[in-house]
UniProtKB/Swiss-Prot annotation:
This protein's name: Uncharacterized 8.9 kDa protein in Gp30-rIII intergenic region
Species of origin: Enterobacteria phage T4
One Pfam family this sequence matches: DUF2883
Domain of life: Viruses
Gene designation: y12H
Length: 75
């Protein structure tokens, strides 16, 4: 069951290995902030990229909200 906070990862032309690296980074960093991310691959027909969305976010503490800022990388 999806919650209301569906977040899409990806943009046109994003290499699959970069997307996998981003998901791994979110899974690694998330638990230290009380967050759990689960991903499901949802390819869109007719698009040249793959969107990944977070199936579930479980907040262990609601004392703060962390805004994730991905690292800037040259492609």
């Amino acid at each position: 069951m999806l919650n209301n906070n569906v977040v899409y990862l990806g943009y046109p032309g994003l290499p699959p290995n970069k997307l996998e690296g981003l998901m791994l980074e979110l899974r690694t960093v998330g638990p230290s902030f009380g967050l759990e991310f689960r991903f499901q691959d949802t390819p869109r027909r007719g698009k040249n990229y793959t969107q990944m969305h977070i199936l579930k976010q479980r907040f262990k503490t609601r004392a703060f909200v962390m805004h994730y800022k991905p690292r800037k990388e040259k492609f």
